[in-house]
């Protein structure tokens, strides 16, 4: 009986704390100035639930952002203003890994609405099954609102690599980026 009462008390306490915390977070973040980064990976690929978003939910996400006080942050502006204090509410959209489903599902929406984003690309899987091609990546990077970002070569857990292996991975990606798109992306997203 004592254990049941203690468990009930803990449950009620946690419930009340979380209710207050959520209310306090809403009050706090509604006045926040700065950048929120929202990261996506796969689109309409239900076989990968941990990294997938259904396209109707993605569209809803974009509509919520458009109707909020936040504005989309163009990656080129973000790059220039990186070290400056952020005085406006901004959303930075990022897409990791260059999956083909991004190109087929989300890219047409972002292109139509001219919504800025960063596409972080690991060079090793490009063109393989389920991934974008270099022509598709170049198309995104050549747009006014899509920016290509660096995501390593292998997309391995770089923390498990030696310093020399880490440097070789990045240098290999740099060389491929230069060959395929003509430049090395300035923005880097650490894999995992």
Q: Can you name each region flagged by the protein language model?
A:
Residues 96-97:
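Noncatalytic alpha-helical scaffolds and linker/capping helices
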Residues 33, 38-48, 87-91, 100-192:
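Metal-dependent polysaccharide deacetylase catalytic core of the NodB/CE4 family, i.e.
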Residues 16-91:
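N-terminal pre-catalytic segment of deacetylase/amide-hydrolase enzymes
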Residues 5-15:
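Bacterial N-terminal signal peptides
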